[in-house]
């Protein structure tokens, strides 16, 4: 191949000009390929009769001939210019590939004919896809077997075309530093019919074509009439318009992903930022993975000058779509990227500029290392652990970092090995798996913050069907980092009754760790009954004061979809019943269901946009003092599912009444957003089952109805069961809370 390449380089250096005879195609012979459109122009005169070929009137350089020989002769008469650029290794049938090696006798007059390399003495033919050194000229039947076995059988099929394997030196020859041209060595390879890329392995070529199909790039360059791009759809959410590409709900088929199911996530983050904007202004905000830019557009459109929004994305198509969406919402775009793109923002007459948005195109880790922000939101595809270190590197003091994790298969214990790989955590499927997932993410966030000498305060954590959202406030200093690191502990989980308790602090090895569990399953069941999960976040997951300010902002901006969820989070953080069974709550009062809602005027008194260094220091100290007060009232960890612990043959009480029964027994109790039938309480599992059994009624079948139950017999049965449960608890030495 090197000798052949050197022979081809000699006429390039001398730049010879030769006259190329262009034969007139006949019905019994193959057409001679036409020159490429981007090669030297060849003007052919009026064709003569078929017996005498007409030479071209314009001189053609020798390098242009080599480029013209790589074109398909079967498409020389095609009207489309893009169709003639297809490589000769891409054909429809095997016969078309064989025609490339066939040349009529009249074409052999000139030594510099287009297919002179394909002929040899004795009417032998050479392979059009192999150099002379690899496959010498041979007879037609032998060439047929060679093309069929070596090129056609290992081809890749796509839309009726076959991308055959090619052995020619197809890489362009580039001069080195001295100026000498050195031929590039390339083995067997394929040419992509869509993007003309060169792929070495067949499996890689299949994956390459599959990626084109997933992105909708099936309209390749050989199609004569290229179809117009499908129109973009405009969606509206929270008074913000966004253009979305086709297949916007499938990440594999679009460059700009938009998930309508994440609406609750976007509204929660908006209320978080709105509550933070009441403390200090202006805020440097970052949406590290913009996609369509819907989240950053909502920030800038509804919060105005209180925020300075930066939307980042590494995909060039997404950056272009973000800029278009900014203009659609009358927002000025400030472009900042490594490629130094410059685009003028032109507004139509009568339009008003609502604000500025900075759009960047770079890696999220690089951007967070270069600039400091007050608010950072991370929403990557899958896990977010790869971006936590850079997020806490330059975050300002008392700033907020929100993390959305969509790798629910690993967090919800469906792929336990992936959770161990990403989070360094050992988990199993439990009844409280959603809260377990939230504590796993918080533990990863806490470790990343501690590595940067920063601590965290968890404002709230939400785990729903499609995502896990964790929002934390950053506290600078090694003292805060040490306090945060102490809250990461292991969890002891009983596999029989699913009782759980955090392991005690200490470096000493305990002889019998089963003693820490309130249950007596280890003594009554054979073998090892408990496992160790974690490390997990063991402290509170909610900040009541911040959640109340979020509820106020949701009322102020009219976000009705998340008000019920925020109220549930508030009651869950306080661990108090949301309602009274006999007295209905009045939702018209400022105090809704036991939650006092601050107005906008009240929240301004807590603002931290103070003037002067001394005043700002005082407000910061007050803020930290208020945060410590909120953290002290921690809610009980984890919850119990009332259906999971129901008694066979008994009808459970209503969930509302059961919460009151637990509260009357002296336990803290509330519902949880993690599970619609879950109960968060500080009661141990044995007491939980005892109260559930006490107020359950027997199930009757047959002609009797459930309402005909004698109260005396019911109390007697419940008392007996409770006494037996208490006797077992006292015999096992269990601690009753």
From Swiss-Prot:
Positions of post-translational Phosphoserine modification: 72, 616
EC supergroup of this enzyme: transferase
Catalytically driven reaction(s): guanosine(27) in tRNA(Tyr) + 2 S-adenosyl-L-methionine = N(2)-dimethylguanosine(27) in tRNA(Tyr) + 2 S-adenosyl-L-homocysteine + 2 H(+)
GO CC term (a single one): nucleolus
Compositionally biased tracts (Pro residues): 50-62
Residue ranges annotated for the Trm1 methyltransferase domain, each copy included: 233-692
Biased composition (Acidic residues): 1-10
Region spans: Disordered: 1-65
Cellular compartments annotated: Nucleus, Nucleolus
Cross-link for Glycyl lysine isopeptide (Lys-Gly) (interchain with G-Cter in SUMO2), residue positions: 589
InterPro entries the UniProt entry points to: SAM-dependent_MTases_sf (IPR029063), Trm1 (IPR002905), tRNA_met_Trm1_C (IPR042296), Znf_C2H2_type (IPR013087)
Superkingdom, natural source: Eukaryota
Annotated positions of the Phosphothreonine modification: 24
C2H2-type zinc-finger residues: 190-212
Family: Belongs to the class I-like SAM-binding methyltransferase superfamily. Trm1 family.
Protein name: tRNA (guanine(27)-N(2))-dimethyltransferase
Organism: Bos taurus (Bovine)
